[in-house]
Amino acid sequence: RLDEGSPFVDARLPDGTRFHAVLAPLARPGTLVSLRVPRTRTFTVAELVASGTLSAGTARVLEAVVARRLAFLVSGGTGSGKTTLLAALLSLVAPEERVVVVEDASELRPDHPHVVALEGRPPNIEGAGAVDVRTLVRQALRMRPDRLVVGEVRGAEVVDLLAALNTGHEGGCGTLHANSALDVPARIEAYTLSLHDALPI
């Protein structure tokens, strides 16, 4: 629905393109439409090295992190390539492992034969029926994932992800908005506190 009563909308087109629109007068000088077209394929780690995005040494370290089933977060600013790097790293996961990806809006497309994807859902026009990432993380844990992936950690789901990583779910990963690696703990703390704010007193 896109009209005066609901002047903005997020949707996904049949080819996977994400569509966002805001009507005037909220948008100036007029109605704005944004399209986010998904990549048709995933870059490999080797291609990221060849393009100069990663050094060979960094690639070896990241490959070892994946092979040893260590938990990790890819952090960076908006448009810095977090999803691109995470998809490339997930493509290194052994083909017999089950990768369960949880996202608010589907973006990750790792080149892996055993990927299960769960995607959040906004509320309908009556305000009902929403399914958030936190709920989907809990559902994913019931699917016996070899790798639990949260495409973008940006809320209270960080609590469930960290709990899973500390109770035997090795190799879990995700992305997180942060200006530097040093900022990551503070971001995680802020997301955890957002859960506290939502609790009834």
Region roles according to the model:
Residues 1, 25, 38-41, 51, ...:
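Conserved, well-folded catalytic cores of nucleic-acid-processing
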Residues 1-68:
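P-loop NTP-binding catalytic core
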Residues 39-50, 87-138, 184-187:
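P-loop NTPase switch/communication element
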Residues 71:
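Walker A (P-loop) ATP-phosphate-binding motif of ABC ATPase nucleotide-binding domains
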Residues 74:
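Hydrophobic anchor at the beta1->P-loop junction of P-loop NTPases
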Residues 79:
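Walker A (P-loop) phosphate-binding loop of P-loop NTPases
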Residues 82:
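Conserved lysine of the Walker
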Residues 103, 108-116, 140-200:
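Conserved P-loop NTPase nucleotide-binding/switch module
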